[in-house]
Design a protein with these regions (language model features):
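Aromatic-residue detector
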Residues: 20, 31, 80, 104-105
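Short glycine-rich anion-binding loops that position phosphate/pyrophosphate groups of nucleotides
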Residues: 1, 71-75
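N-terminal active-site beta-alpha-beta segment that forms phosphate/nucleotide-binding
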Residues: 1-61
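Surface-exposed, charge/polar-rich loops and edge strands
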Residues: 37, 52, 57, 61-66, ...
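Conserved alpha/beta enzyme-core scaffold
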Residues: 18, 66-68
Length: 138
């Protein structure tokens, strides 16, 4: 997965509310408002970087943009995660009209059908690579 820290900082500096997930038992997540001084450490529920401290946010009821970590994505938006289902469960709760963006390297965008899919998998609308944003045919 590409490093999105610079983009997070740029969005924050522009006044955009940036939130990062914290893993909870049962493959659930809460969200914490991100700022440049927020401490990040490997989580205790899932072995991924997540916020230490910070208050959980009430998420908006209007559509939002969600950047999803991914190991791969195909041309129609099928996303391969790490298999925990955290993001798939969360995406089910998003307001209609929300946009899903898979953060991947350019060589992790595959032709249609080359990424394994399950019925519950979240499908991305865009792939965000270091080379730019690419619309997917979801």
């Amino acid at each position: 997965e590409p490093d999105v820290a610079l983009a997070m900082r740029s969005l924050h500096d522009a006044g955009v509310r940036v939130a990062v997930p914290r893993s909870l038992p049962g493959s659930r997540m809460s969200w914490v408002r991100w700022h440049p001084d927020l401490d990040i450490a490997i989580g205790t529920v899932a072995p991924v970087p997540e916020p230490v401290g910070g208050e959980d946010l009430e998420l908006p009821t209007h559509p939002m943009v969600l950047v999803l970590p991914a190991l791969a994505v195909d041309a129609v938006g099928v996303r391969l995660g790490q298999g925990g289902g955290f993001y798939d469960r969360f995406v089910e709760t998003l307001p209609a009209g929300s946009v899903l963006v898979a953060a991947v390297f350019e060589d992790e965008v595959y032709p249609t059908g080359e990424v394994p899919a399950e019925p519950w998998d979240a499908v991305a609308d865009y792939a965000w690579t270091p080379q730019g944003l690419r619309a997917l045919d979801s």
